[in-house]
Amino acid sequence: LGDVYKRQIQNAYNLLNRTFEVGGSEIAHREDVGLLAYSPIAQGYLSGKYQNGALPKGSRKELFDRLQRYEGPYAEEAIQAYLDIGTKYNIDPSQLANQFVTSKPFVTSNIIGATNMDQLKLAVTSIEVNLTEEIYSDIEKAFQKHGNVAS
């Protein structure tokens, strides 16, 4: 992970919500503050489990009915773009999302929210995923097209 920081800030940060990159990361670097990034897979949306209106039994969305942050008018299209990148490079979408967050130099800790052992294994092994320049380029193209879709 990134440098060792004595002070931390905790913000949501993921492929769909990169607002911290604009200003926040610069100020944090200047003030020697690291980012504890939470919601790296966007409340599960970047795993693909909620695509096309799916509502898996036992999921947080089903249990608590309060996960609308990533359901704005352009969110599903943006999510699909990142899922397609994972498919293109044969990378599990959760691992792609987690490693994207972990790879950022301003991130000192990636706060995962695994609710079962399979999710935990995917999160922990995401560190082994090599995000090449080509993958980062595809991620940036998707971000340029869709931007921050968290509401």
Protein language model features and the residues they cover:
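Short, small-residue-biased leader/transition segments that mark boundaries at the very start
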Residues: 1-5
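Structural preference for beta-strand elements that scaffold enzyme active sites
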Residues: 6-10, 34-36, 108-111
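Conserved, mostly hydrophobic/aromatic
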Residues: 9, 28, 35-38, 82, ...
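Glycine-rich beta-alpha junction loops
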Residues: 13-17, 39-46, 100, 116
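Alpha-helical segments flanking ligand/cofactor-binding loops in enzyme cores
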Residues: 22-26, 99
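Glycine-rich, positively charged active-site loop/lid region within alpha/beta enzyme cores that binds
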Residues: 26-85
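Conserved short secondary-structure transition element at the edge of the structured enzyme core
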Residues: 71-128
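C-terminal amphipathic alpha-helical "assembly" element
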Residues: 102-103, 117-144, 148-151
